Amino acid sequence: MFKYAIIGGTALKSMKSIETKHIENEYGLCEYNVLNEDTIFVPRHGMNYYVPPIFINYRANIKAMKDLGVEYAYAINSVGSLREEVEPLTIVMATDFLDFTKKRDYTFFTGLDKGVKFIAMDEPYSLEMNRLFEEKYDGKIMTGVLVTTEGPKFETKIENKFYKSIGGDVVGMTGSPEVILANELGIKYASLNVVGNYGTGVTDKHVEITNEQEDIALKAAYVVLDIYKAGLNFNDGAKFL
């Protein structure tokens, strides 16, 4: 059984692992790497191939983590900035989200034998996990609101203008429904969003820093491992859903 998880994309596949395993549940197959005796890495897009964000089996992944005993999960995402002041290579720790996905599976509780559950979303991301990461990370970092779109297309200028106007700070394609499903199963969840560029229409500046973005994501993952090794020393009174 494992207590901790890191969820991420292709940038994290180079993390040193003990072995690769898989687990199957009623929602499908989940592949994962064992990083140490307490921690696993779950590659959203698959281990040896690439599944687009719209087709990721989020329920299979989250249910697998729950079945494996996971209590804490840091997700690391690649995103674009909706604001000129949110510069590339910044990590934005999500404190809230806007979900503009359309055709994904958003709940485990589908009625009948699965029952129905209405989950509170007043604190979808663990503020204590954010705090611990901010204490240990030495790069550009801030908090903000994560917008998730369906993809696979990128957002239009007017879409990004709208997302910014309603409070969005960064935009990506993998944040939802992952955060919702983690909350449903009681997994304490944080989202670290690595800004790779500006969204369409945000600025005239052209920024292309794919390699640096991957380096930042990998650096963040190793910071998370250090947090896990320290045993997640939360303050008394920390609030979790």
Where on the chain are the PLM-derived regions?
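Metabolite-binding pocket within alpha/beta catalytic cores that recognizes anionic/polar moieties
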Residues: M1-I119
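Generic hydrophobic/aromatic pocket-lining and core-packing "Φ" positions
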Residues: I62, N160, S176-V179
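Non-catalytic positions within long, well-ordered alpha-helices that form the structural scaffold/packing
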Residues: K66-G69, K164, N183
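Short acidic/polar active-site loop segments enriched in Thr and Asp
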Residues: E71-Y72, D169, K188
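Active-site rim beta-loop-alpha module in soluble metabolic enzymes
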Residues: D122-S165
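Zn-dependent metallopeptidase/amidohydrolase metal-coordination segment
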Residues: M173-I209
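His/Asp/Glu-rich mid-to-C-terminal helical/loop segments that flank catalytic regions of hydrolases
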Residues: T200-L241
